[in-house]
Amino acid sequence: MASPSPANSPMPPPQAPSPMAPPSQSPAPSPHSPYPHQQPGPLQGPPPPGHPGAYGHPMQHGPPGQGPPGHHMPPHHQGMIFSKGPHMGMQMPPTGPNMSPYQTHGMPPNAPTQPCIVSPGGPPGGPPPPERSSQENLHALQRAIDSMEEKGLQEDPRYSQLLAMRATSKHQHLNGNQVNLLRTQITAYRLLARNKPISMQMQQALQAAQQQPPPGPPIGPPGAPGGPPPGSQHAGQPPVPPQQQQQPPPSAGTPPQCSTPPASNPYGPPVPGQKMQVAPPPPHMQQGQPLPPQPPQVGGPPPIQQQQPPQQQQQQSQPPPPEPHQHQLPNGGKPLSMGPSGGQPLIPSSPMQPQVRGTLPGMPPGSQVPQPGGGPQRQVPPAGMPMPKPNRITTVAKPVGLDPITLLQERENRIAARISLRMQELQRLPATMSEDLRLQAAIELRALRVLNFQRQLRMEFVQCTRRDTTLETALNIKLYKRTKRQGLREARATEKLEKQQKLEAERKRRQKHLEFLAAVLQHGKDLREFHRNNKAQLARMNKAVMNHHANAEREQKKEQERIEKERMRRLMAEDEEGYRKLIDQKKDKRLAFLLSQTDEYISNLTQMVKQHKDDQMKKKEEEGKRLIQFKKELLMSGEYIGIDEGSIVADMRVHVVEQCTGKKLTGDDAPMLKHLHRWLNMHPGWDWIDDEEDSCGSNDDHKPKVEEQPTATEDATDKAQATGNDEDAKDLITKAKVEDDEYRTEEQTYYSIAHTIHEKVVEQASIMVNGTLKEYQIKGLEWLVSLYNNNLNGILADEMGLGKTIQTISLVTYLMDRKKVMGPYLIIVPLSTLPNWVLEFEKWAPAVGVVSYKGSPQGRRLLQNQMRATKFNVLLTTYEYVIKDKAVLAKIQWKYMIIDEGHRMKNHHCKLTQVLNTHYIAPYRLLLTGTPLQNKLPELWALLNFLLPSIFKSCSTFEQWFNAPFATTGEKVELNEEETILIIRRLHKVLRPFLLRRLKKEVEHQLPDKVEYIIKCDMSALQRVLYKHMQSKGVLLTDGSEKGKHGKGGAKALMNTIVQLRKLCNHPFMFQHIEEKYCDHTGGHGVVSGPDLYRVSGKFELLDRILPKLKATNHRVLLFCQMTQCMTIIEDYLGWRQFGYLRLDGTTKAEDRGELLRKFNAKGSDVFVFLLSTRAGGLGLNLQTADTVVIFDSDWNPHQDLQAQDRAHRIGQRNEVRVLRLMTVNSVEERILAAARYKLNMDEKVIQAGMFDQKSTGSERQQFLQTILHQDDNEEEEENEVPDDEMINMMIARSEEEIEIFKRMDAERKKEDEEIHPGRERLIDESELPDWLTKDDDEVERFHYQYDEDTILGRGSRQRKEVDYTDSLTEKEWLKAIDDGAEFDEEEEEDDSKRKRRKRKNRKEESDDDSLILKRRRRQNLDKRSKKQMHKIMSAVIKHNQDGRTLSEPFMKLPSRQRLPDYYEIIKRPVDIKKILQRIEDCKYADLNELEKDFMQLCQNAQIYNEEASLIYLDSIALQKVFVGARQRITAAADAAAVAAGDNTGEAHGNGGSDNSDNDDDDGGDDGSDDEEIATTSAAAVKMKLKLNKSLASAPATPTQSSSNVSSGAATTSKKQTRRKRSQKKYTISDDDDDDMD
């Protein structure tokens, strides 16, 4: 097959070899080639005779033209450059007449494709010249490698490629014929396995391989050199080397063997017709001559030798070209690839045909010619290293494999048989077939008949096509070219053209280089753009994925919130069934655990309630049997005649019978046992009878008409049947099922089991007169009666003011009227409410005999005698008398025990509970309380244990149920809102049968509202000075008279700092010597009166502004105070103001208290203020004629204050109630109020996990005390802001008219004050104080240490033992312990840092005092510097308008709390522009940053409260920008002015203007304070330790012992007799303290 001519060939012309690449390489395999790249293993030589080849069949040398067929070249392999003859690195397999060129696979897949280099001087069609031998290629490759090493280019990637080429070009394993044959066999096997036909070319190749004879045995002795047989050399052939000439010829009949040694590289095809022999080693090897280095031989299949193709035989007849220059091999061999006849070079038939491997004629048998284009081979070891011995060729024959030719022939035979069989079938078809089927059969028969003809025609056509398209010039382009002689002119033209070509080539090269650079740059840009687009796309995809997941998560969260809201809705709607379904769907283990726990607890409680009722029933039956037996004994013995009417059986009925007629009287008609004797005398002929069926007397005779409690569903079913409407009936039944008792268990409901006997009560008892009970009170009476009928005890816990007293009286009268239970009833009440109970009984039940058991011991003994002599129904007494006179009162068989203010029983171990449980016997008990849970859960358990000890036995079990439900599961103890509601509902479930609580807002809609305000009061200068030293050092300043230094000042330490601080907050004159020395300073007579009473106290000053306004608008005031000494000072103030008042405290006698209540509640009473102590007057009093409650100082227990508030906010109140709680800013009262709020929050939530199990230790209490004493003042200024007159007027006013009245009164007051005392403040300032009160810290510290000398050394008496105060006491007990047993120890701390920190804090506290001159000076300087700037900034903000609208108008003044109450709930720190302007005037801003902070807070408040799209929201954002811009503009102008002023004044002012001088003042002030700090670093800090007297802790408290005293230090006897009761040291009552007996 001819190759294309250079003119029309798409291949570029051959180029010279490059030094950077091997001189000659085979073309690389195309990546699109259908044939996989095979890397043959190393060759070890041909197998012995008869041994099968490497591919399963014996190696044979068949006739020419029967070699393996070539493979068709893929159409896209057009970039290959072919040489004119066979290349040294190419292996040309023999090709048949119809074989296409074959692409060799000698190079590795990653080898670059380079054109094959053609020898420039070789003749056309001749063999490659020796100059281009492989050895020269290796030398050129080595030179390129050495050149790169000299230039230091070892890191260049081409260097490693050259090394790989050098390593791989030294040995080849398989030649092209072997590879082709191997691939042909593999392809044939694959086609046979897939049952596919094999092409004709493949069949010819396989047949040629099969017909090759196996190589014969070697000729000659072992080791003798072999050569070709005689006559094989033709004329013109170069002479054979001597080694080959000396070889004897082979014997006849034995074919010569292939001369190719193992791993030899063929450089020419073998001679046709000559058998190839295995050449023995040459003589120089036998003589020990050194061999050239060879690669190590690895075992592998021997090469398959193929005969010369017929194309080469045809080319041998051509005339020989001139003989080229011979290349001498290293062993002195002859030129390569000489033909067998006359030395003519062999011409390959196709440029793609690979050569057969062979050895060079002169090379030793073991040497291998390097292959430049070979594949990856093993590297040649360096010279001098010993070569491994090649493996011996084994003589064992390999097993003969399957012959694909035989298989192919069998397949062809089968196909031919099938075709003939099919043709016979088609010829024998019946004539009855349809026309279309017969037509199809005829078509198929003709197609099968013409098959062989088609095959022959196709073969002839293909052969003719190949013969016609094959040209003689295909093999040799210059075959018919006429040579032309070269002349001088042509040479010059040639030179000129050559020069032009060079220039053009250089221009093209540069152009190509530029294009290459441009392409590289463009590729770089494209690459960057590609990656940028990829990143952008990836970012978009990531964003889309994130959005998808965010949306999915949002939807999931919305769904979860919806489900949670639905669960909460059903939970709050008591839909137990629906809630459990949602819990099952959510599969929340915690909620399911709570529900299962609740069911378990309710089940246990149900069993305990059943057991309790059974036990009570058995006791009642046994008691009835015992009474019947006792009555029978009295009748039999006749002792009933003189029976005592107070006997337990005196009221039992006795059945009588008339002897003559047999008539019987039973039931109510029968006489009582106490009247039996008189009745028998009046009715002769009658006699008593013994009736065994007589049960339990009057109790059985008067059984209540009761019925079993029907469920709500049964009632609804009855109503539905009565209505007759199906839809209404369904709705009614469904609603009833939801409203039915949610505590349903398997058998019966928990509540219905507890209240099995249900008695309907529709009206009050007939003996209850002078009023009618409200509907909810009737329901409460019905519940109380149900408790009685079911032998249960309970708690009536209605909110304060709903009439628990009236409901109790109605229960007593109902039992007396309907049940005939005449008593006696024991009602235990506080002493302060005892007169109120007596009044209520006199009003509502005058027919009931009531005994008020109180008074002195002599009076109580008279009452005891009276009780024995006369009948009574109710005994009213107090807690103390129940304990004191238990020997007398416990003997009475009480029917019912009722305890008012039942939260007094909150301590299970208190003396009252123990006495009532051990000494008093009452089958029924009832507690009345408005606050069943005050502090912690065990208090509630104590109440339930007192009522039902058989049900609520263990406190720990009760606490575990409701305190830490998850403590046993190992999960976190904290509860979320839903779990908390479940726990609360669990508590309500447990308490529902035993506790009834209604709120005012639920039952009394007409009751007016109650609004509470906290009014903050400022301190006077006297209060600030005393409070500062008491807080920091625990000392009270004196004038020094106790040390004989009158007027020079002094200090003394006082116990119980917290109480002293509270006293200073109320009034400084609660310390008597302060009042006396102040009188000496002002010229008084020991007692201060007049305006100075309110000017020295912030709270009194506030009262002086409030009380006249309330009196002018006809409001009446209840003023509650904790300390009776403060009440005395308030009395002096009220007397000076001439306000009518009444006073009730712990010292008020019981008989006087009722009179005080009547006087205040009387119509037309002129009493304006009722002055009460919180403990004495805060319980059980009806003072609804007052509508204003002033809490002068808060109690530690918030429920005490709530009780006090409800004295006015109760049934009967017609006006809105205002509660004003006074609190001094920056004082201990803030912490007290915070603790009260904490307790109220606890009471509202009823229970929180882990909240009630904390037991305070001594260290915790110490830390709490230190926190109160040394509180930091870093709170917001808004929280410490004192309200002005306008705000106070809004708090106390009930209408707009009152606000106008209050404004007018404020103006009149200010005018009057200005006229009387012009320029004087309402609170005294520091300038009005004595000199001994204005001492600095150094002097006070010195006074303190002088006072400490006596304290530290002592007076010689024994030291009080220190008690570890770590038990669990309430705040009341703790404060009482501080009052009675605490003392101070001063110790010096060693840490200077702590001392400095404390001094720094003290200095900060001093900075808040207006009395400091330095602070005033700074504020004055501050006014001059920045007040003008602040006004300018605020003016710019106020005047800013947009679209003709002033933006600041809505922000000027906030709406009132009445108009917008929710605003003040959402916004914690309300601010408006008017307030900011007022603060600028008051110099409360130190710099512009504070002003900006407040203004930004104003804008943030507007943005928090309003929606984003609202106009106010947008205006607030705009005002923020206006403020920032105005500040920058004004401050820049001020700085420029300051710089100009500095330039004008020169160097006299230092570095700047007024700002720097102000800074100098500030620095000087700071330096002075630092000096003060340094001077006082040796001062000792006071550290307080709590100590409790052991005798106080162990001895039981009595009313006199439990009274708290005001500790005033070493109090001296007053020299002058004052009208105040200074000897009275009580500030709380003793008889009403709820902790005196705990």
Curated annotation (Swiss-Prot):
Polar residues bias spans: 710-724
Keyword Coiled coil: no
Motif DEGH box per UniProt: ranges: 900-903
Additional note from the record: 'Brahma' means 'fate' in India.
Biased segments, Pro residues type: 7-51, 121-131, 212-231, 238-253, 263-272, 279-304
Ranges annotated as biased composition (Low complexity): 52-63, 201-211, 305-317, 365-382, 1592-1604
CDD domains to which the protein is assigned, alphabetical: Bromo_SNF2L2 (cd05516), DEXHc_SMARCA2_SMARCA4 (cd17996), SF2_C_SNF (cd18793)
PROSITE patterns: BROMODOMAIN_1, BROMODOMAIN_2, HELICASE_ATP_BIND_1, HELICASE_CTER, HSA, QLQ
Residues bound to ATP: 798-805
Organism: Drosophila melanogaster
Biased composition (Acidic residues): 1380-1391, 1557-1574
Composition bias, Basic residues: 1616-1625
GO BP annotations listed: axonogenesis; cell dedifferentiation; chromatin remodeling; dendrite guidance; dendrite morphogenesis; hemocyte proliferation; imaginal disc-derived wing margin morphogenesis; imaginal disc-derived wing vein morphogenesis
Biased composition (Basic and acidic residues): 699-708
Protein name: ATP-dependent helicase brm
GO molecular function: ATP binding; ATP hydrolysis activity; ATP-dependent activity, acting on DNA; chromatin binding; DNA binding; DNA-binding transcription factor binding; helicase activity; histone binding
All copies of domain HSA, residue ranges: 501-573
SUPFAM superfamilies linked: beta-sandwich domain of Sec23/24, BRK domain-like, Bromodomain, P-loop containing nucleoside triphosphate hydrolases
InterPro entries reported for this sequence: BRK_domain (IPR006576), BRK_sf (IPR037259), Bromodomain (IPR001487), Bromodomain-like_sf (IPR036427), Bromodomain_CS (IPR018359), Gln-Leu-Gln_QLQ (IPR014978), Helicase_ATP-bd (IPR014001), Helicase_C-like (IPR001650)
Domain Helicase C-terminal: 1102-1263
Residue ranges of the region described as Disordered: 1-137, 201-387, 691-730, 1380-1412, 1544-1578, 1592-1638
Gene name of this polypeptide: brm
Oligomeric form and interacting partners: Component of the Brahma complex, which is composed of brm, osa, mor, Snr1/Bap45, dalao/Bap111, Bap55, Bap60 and Act42A/Bap47. Interacts with asf1. Associates with the brm-HDAC3-erm repressor complex, composed of brm, HDAC3 and erm. Interacts with erm and HDAC3.
